[in-house]
């Protein structure tokens, strides 16, 4: 009413502006969800599973080289990592699938405002949960195997760029 009273925007223009903002928000979350799902399924889970396989092979080799009690002691950490990788990759897969289904439901909503709310309430929390487990896998998987830049590498590059900009 205030915008209309001073001739800035009509109610219809204000509603249209909000509609665009809601649609933009939804599109950004859609893109983020698709990219995260793709990265999780096509990069992160395969790399984590390969590392897990390497750990399993290491455990079997320890068992063939050492007496049972020593092999168990030497392999304990690897067995913990194997289980953690299995738990985290299963969680990621289940939640990526659930997120895809939640997106399908949200995408059927006609109102851009209601669709944005659905994305905020269901998709964003799923993204955060998936991301948490991916971050934990990033810390576990061998650096040589991890195909994506790690946070510390991005931070280091960012710091280098920042310091070189400051020097110029």
Model-derived regions: residue spans:
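Conserved small/polar residues in nucleotide/adenosyl-binding loops
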Residues: 162-168
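C-terminal amphipathic alpha-helical interaction region
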Residues: 1-160
């Amino acid at each position: 009413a205030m915008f209309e009273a001073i001739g800035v925007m009509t109610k219809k223009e204000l509603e249209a502006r909000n509609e665009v903002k809601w649609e933009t928000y939804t599109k950004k979350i859609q893109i983020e969800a698709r990219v995260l799902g793709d990265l999780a399924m096509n990069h992160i889970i395969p790399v984590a599973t390969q590392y897990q396989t390497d750990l399993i092979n290491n455990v079997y080799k320890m068992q063939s080289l050492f007496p049972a009690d020593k092999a168990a002691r030497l392999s304990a950490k690897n067995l913990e990592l194997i289980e953690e990788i299995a738990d985290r990759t299963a969680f990621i897969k289940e939640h990526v699938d659930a997120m895809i289904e939640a997106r399908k439901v949200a995408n059927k909503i006609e109102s851009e405002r209601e669709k944005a709310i659905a994305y905020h309430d269901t998709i964003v929390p799923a993204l955060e949960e998936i991301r948490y487990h991916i971050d934990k896998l990033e810390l576990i998987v061998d650096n040589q195997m991890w195909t994506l830049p790690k946070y510390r590498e991005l931070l280091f590059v960012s710091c280098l760029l920042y310091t070189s900009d400051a020097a110029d």
